[in-house]
């Protein structure tokens, strides 16, 4: 029984963890034998392992509990390891916005964390989370010390009270801990911006810099002095010397104010942090720092104003005794002292009264010097800070002041000054940036990203960019330059040399041509590319109807980009041909190149579909409107449409024609009213056949050739609407009464015109008429009549003194009457006798020529002489004598209709 109980007791002892008994003898007897027989072969080993408490493999049930005890021992170790890792991570720089700005990327931050781990034990990184929160606590403690300590030293006589001692001991302890941490905190090398983590280098740098000041401000020198004095004879302490000791202790307590250096350093670090993260927060922090420093200096000065009389036992001539404030409360004493100090520092007076004693006088002068210096520094810093907050607006104001001085120097008129002011307001919007310089300093990917973002609205509204290669869009946008045009500004002028093309970001512009239609361009449209493709002159004028914000592209940059993207060049050329077709013009260079591309087969199906979509969108974006300046204009007013802008400016009234031109043979049946034509939204491609009625005024070529179709009635009906006809009574009212002249030349001219009318009617009847035409056979087309009746090279001279010469198109295209005159230029009688109407004139009346060459207009408005065709013979003397009588008309009849009184 005993032998059986011992194993149980042994097993119980194993359960308790006491498995080793060195003083116990080994068991003997049958029980021991039974135990040896009953114990498995591995039982001894298992028991041995259990006795050593290191059991990783257990046979049977004897090893389960030691494994649980091992897990119980590992729990505190794991918890300690977790806390140690957390605390170590706080000493390392965290992945935050500030550290990413400092080191550049997350990989660099992780590399810096590894440096901290390998630097040594308890090395604190200056940008770690632990140092951040510790500096925040130290900042609050320093502000409290710098405010409370001067008040306690000055206005409280008892320095040994329990609250005061607790406050001083706690603050001194915290500052001593900060002193120790500075030996383990890494420093930043100002030369290389590298963070030093070597403990030896950190220690040497701190000992050479701020250690002495921090050590003196952290040691409680006043309490050490009091402890030493209390160890001496108590009789001595109670004598008059005790008062001096207290005074000296107060002075020693002022050494804690040297903690101001730490405050300045910490504030500077926080300014750097806010400056690198938030510009506005940095400005706010700087403003609060300036205000706080001014208030702190005023607080110290106020305490000094009262401390000096206190150390002198309040002499009778000091300001405290004069105001009878020796026994007042400390709040009243502090208020008067602060008012006196701020009056000195702000240079606005001496406070309640002027200083009397010598000590007050010197303190007042010191306050004035310190206050003036601080005030100047505050004003300077505040001014620089305000200017730095909005430097772009300040640059705009300086720039506009120069513009105002320029306008005053040149004495520009008021309306022009207003236009310049409006331009600057819409162009810069109150801020000026050197955008070109800013973008040039960036790398290519960042610059392209910025340009794509700035022009996102243009890309979104422009079909050409929507269907183009993204690389082409980026290359094109990087070459653009921003421009602004005011309402009424001519962006491009017809006939000028083209050096830029424009993309409309926002605004409305009108395309002005010589036809009876004006087209509008809106957001996403572009123009001016035709000259860049052909190296020619402008084919139309574009005028801004509203404030237009455009992007311009120079010809060099245009060609540079299109050389890399030939498909986009073909897209520009296709759209240019379609646009010229819509305004009734052609360009041989573009047509030849387009035909060459078709013959060579460079277009594939995909490109054809893309080009069709681009042309379709371009037609949809262009808005065609009827003319608004000529409400009574007929369908093809060749007289006004072919007049140059210079001649219109020079001539304020339509030309005067002879009264004899209004014969009965030239008048048709009257129409109810003159109707304004209603043009279609988009001109059809067949408008090339009518291009002769609206040729360009200032062409880059010396001559321009236009093709005529056969003069059928259907085409005549397309080219000209029925002209308003006057009754005979209306003609008599509009005709001025000429002076009596011989009637024989007039009768000859009328007979000649009647013969010409009959011949033309016979020719019209002989020609086949197109089916579906509504034009009667006896209708005479005005433009063909002018070609029949006159020589193409003959110069038609005006009869108005206000118009020196008409443009050359009048001699080739005279198709409709002027609204105010009511007669056609085709009915002007030819100033020549019947005997001269032979030869070339007869040949020209026989048929309509298939090709008509229009000469370029000269500066004087006349036509250069034709070298290929001999000039017509001069008119007879009888007709020359008749012209003066034609000009001698009633002046009263002409005044309401003409600007010049003839």
Swiss-Prot record:
Q: Does the keyword Lyase apply?
A: no
Any one Gene Ontology BP term = general adaptation syndrome, behavioral process
Q: Where is this region: Disordered?
A: 1-75, 634-681, 713-824, 858-902
Which residues of this UniProt protein bind 3',5'-cyclic AMP?
528-529, 531, 538-539, 579, 582
Q: Which residues cross the membrane?
A: 132-153, 163-183, 205-225, 250-270, 285-307, 361-381
Q: Report the activity regulation comment.
A: Activated by cAMP, and at 10-100 times higher concentrations, also by cGMP. cAMP binding promotes tetramerization and formation of an active channel. Compared to other family members, cAMP has less stimulatory effect on HCN1 because part of the molecules already contain bound cAMP and form homotetramers when cAMP levels are low, this inherent tetramerization in HCN1 results in a weaker response to increased cAMP.
Compositional bias of type Polar residues: which residue ranges? Answer: 770-793
Report where it is expressed, by tissue: Highly expressed in cerebral cortex, cerebellum, throughout the hippocampus, in medial habenula, anterior dorsal nucleus in the thalamus, tenia tecta, several nuclei of the general motor system and in optic nerve layer. Detected in a subset of elongated cells in taste buds.
Q: Where is the composition biased (Low complexity)?
A: 639-680, 720-736, 744-769
Q: Which reaction does it catalyse?
A: Na(+)(in) = Na(+)(out); K(+)(in) = K(+)(out)
Q: Which residues lie within the membrane without crossing it?
A: 334-355
Q: Which UniProt keywords apply?
A: cAMP, cAMP-binding, Cell membrane, Glycoprotein, Ion channel, Ion transport, Ligand-gated ion channel, Membrane, Nucleotide-binding, Potassium, Potassium channel, Potassium transport, Sodium, Sodium channel, Sodium transport, Transmembrane, Transmembrane helix, Transport, Voltage-gated channel
| UniProt KW Membrane keyword | yes
- Any one Pfam family match given in the protein's UniProt record, by short name: cNMP_binding
Q: Which InterPro entries match?
A: cNMP-bd_CS (IPR018488), cNMP-bd_dom (IPR000595), cNMP-bd_dom_sf (IPR018490), Ion_trans_dom (IPR005821), Ion_trans_N (IPR013621), K/Na_HCN_channel (IPR051413), K_chnl_volt-dep_EAG/ELK/ERG (IPR003938), RmlC-like_jellyroll (IPR014710)
**Subunit notes for this chain?**
Homotetramer. Heterotetramer with HCN2. The potassium channel is composed of a homo- or heterotetrameric complex of pore-forming subunits. Interacts with KCNE2. Interacts with the SH3 domain of CSK.
**Functional summary from the UniProt entry:** Hyperpolarization-activated ion channel that are permeable to sodium and potassium ions. Exhibits weak selectivity for potassium over sodium ions. Contributes to the native pacemaker currents in heart (If) and in neurons (Ih). Participates in cerebellar mechanisms of motor learning. May mediate responses to sour stimuli.
User: What is this protein's name?
Assistant: Potassium/sodium hyperpolarization-activated cyclic nucleotide-gated channel 1
Instruction: Record the organism.
Output: Rattus norvegicus (Rat)
Q: What is the lineage of its organism?
A: Eukaryota, Metazoa, Chordata, Craniata, Vertebrata
């Amino acid at each position: 029984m005993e032998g059986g109980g011992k194993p149980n007791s042994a097993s119980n002892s194993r359960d308790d963890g006491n498995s080793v008994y060195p003083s116990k003898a080994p068991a003997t007897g049958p029980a021991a034998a039974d135990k040896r027989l009953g114990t498995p072969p591995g039982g001894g080993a298992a028991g041995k392992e259990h006795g050593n408490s290191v059991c990783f493999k257990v046979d049977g049930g004897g090893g389960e509990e030691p494994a649980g005890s091992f897990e119980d021992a590992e729990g505190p170790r794991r918890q300690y390891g977790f806390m140690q890792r957390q605390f170590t991570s706080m000493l390392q720089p965290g992945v935050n916005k500030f550290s990413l700005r400092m080191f550049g990327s997350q990989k660099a931050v992780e590399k810096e964390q590894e440096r901290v781990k390998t630097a040594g034990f308890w090395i604190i990184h200056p940008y770690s989370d632990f140092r951040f929160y510790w500096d925040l606590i130290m900042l609050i403690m320093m502000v409290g010390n710098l405010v409370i300590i001067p008040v306690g030293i000055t206005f409280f006589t008892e320095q040994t009270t329990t609250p005061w001692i607790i406050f001083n001991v706690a603050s001194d302890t915290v500052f001593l801990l900060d002193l120790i941490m500075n030996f383990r905190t890494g420093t930043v090398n100002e030369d290389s911006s590298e963070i030093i983590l070597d403990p030896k280098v950190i220690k040497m740098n701190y000992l050479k810099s701020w250690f002495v000041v921090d050590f003196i401000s952290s040691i409680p020198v006043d309490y050490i002095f009091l402890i030493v004095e209390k160890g001496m004879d108590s009789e001595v302490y109670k004598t008059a010397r005790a008062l001096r000791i207290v005074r000296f202790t107060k002075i020693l307590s002022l050494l804690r104010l040297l903690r101001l250096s730490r405050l300045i350093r910490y504030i500077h670090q926080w300014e750097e942090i806010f400056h690198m993260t938030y510009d506005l927060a940095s400005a706010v922090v700087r403003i609060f720092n300036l205000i706080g420093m001014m208030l702190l200096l005023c607080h110290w000065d106020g305490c000094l104003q009262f401390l000096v009389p206190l150390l002198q036992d309040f002499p009778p001539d000091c300001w405290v005794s004069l105001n009878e404030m020796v026994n007042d409360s400390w709040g009243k004493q502090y208020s008067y002292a602060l008012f006196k100090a701020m009056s000195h520092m702000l240079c606005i007076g001496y406070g309640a009264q002027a200083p009397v004693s010598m000590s007050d006088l010197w303190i007042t002068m010191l306050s004035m010097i310190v206050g003036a210096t601080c005030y100047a520094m505050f004003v300077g810093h505040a001014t620089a800070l305000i200017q730095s907050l909005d430097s772009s607006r300040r640059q705009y104001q300086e720039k506009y002041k120069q513009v105002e001085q320029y306008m005053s120097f040149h004495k520009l008129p008021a309306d022009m000054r207003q236009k310049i002011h409006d331009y600057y307001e819409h162009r810069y919007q109150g801020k000026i940036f050197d955008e070109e310089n800013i973008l040039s300093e960036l790398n290519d990917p960042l610059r392209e990203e910025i340009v794509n973002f700035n022009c996102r609205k243009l890309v979104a509204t422009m079909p050409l960019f929507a269907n183009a290669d993204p690389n082409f869009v980026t290359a094109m946008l990087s070459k653009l330059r921003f421009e602004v045009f005011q309402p009424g500004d001519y962006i491009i002028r017809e006939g000028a040399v083209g050096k830029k093309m424009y993309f409309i970001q926002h605004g409305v512009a009108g395309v002005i041509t010589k036809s009876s239609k004006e087209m509008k361009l809106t957001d996403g449209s572009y123009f001016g590319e035709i000259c860049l493709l052909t190296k020619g002159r402008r084919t139309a004028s574009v005028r801004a109807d509203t404030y237009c914000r455009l992007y311009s592209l120079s010809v060099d940059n245009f060609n540079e980009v299109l050389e890399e993207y030939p498909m986009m060049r073909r897209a520009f050329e296709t759209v240019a041909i379609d646009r010229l077709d819509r305004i009734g013009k052609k360009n041989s260079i573009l047509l030849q190149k387009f035909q060459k591309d078709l013959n060579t087969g460079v277009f594939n199906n995909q490109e054809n579909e893309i080009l069709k979509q681009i042309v379709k969108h371009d037609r949809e974006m262009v808005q065609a409107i009827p003319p608004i300046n000529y409400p009574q204009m007929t369908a093809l007013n060749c007289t006004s449409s072919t007049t140059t802008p210079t001649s219109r400016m020079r001539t304020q009234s339509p030309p005067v024609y002879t009264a004899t031109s209004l014969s009965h043979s030239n008048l048709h049946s009257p129409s109810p009213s003159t109707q304004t034509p209603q043009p279609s939204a988009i001109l059809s491609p067949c408008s090339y056949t009518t291009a002769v009625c609206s040729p360009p005024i200032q062409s880059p070529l010396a001559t321009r050739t236009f093709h005529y179709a056969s003069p059928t009635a259907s085409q005549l009906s397309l080219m000209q609407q029925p002209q308003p006809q006057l009754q005979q009574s209306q003609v008599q009212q509009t005709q001025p009464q000429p002076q009596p002249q011989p009637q024989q030349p007039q009768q000859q001219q009328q007979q000649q015109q009647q013969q010409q009318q009959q011949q033309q009617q016979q020719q019209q009847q002989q020609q086949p008429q197109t089916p579906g035409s509504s034009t009667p056979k006896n209708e005479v087309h005005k433009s063909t009549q002018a070609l029949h009746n006159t020589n193409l090279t003959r110069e038609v001279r005006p009869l108005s003194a206000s118009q020196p010469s008409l443009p050359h198109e009048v001699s080739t295209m005279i198709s409709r009457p002027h609204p105010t005159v009511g007669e056609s230029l085709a009915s002007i009688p030819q100033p020549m006798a019947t005997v001269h109407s032979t030869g070339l004139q007869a040949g020209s009346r026989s048929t309509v020529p298939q090709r008509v060459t229009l000469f370029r207009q000269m500066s004087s408005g006349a036509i250069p002489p034709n070298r290929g065709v001999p000039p017509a013979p001069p008119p007879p003397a009888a007709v020359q004598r008749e012209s003066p009588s034609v000009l001698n008309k009633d002046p009263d009849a002409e005044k309401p209709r003409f600007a010049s009184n003839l």
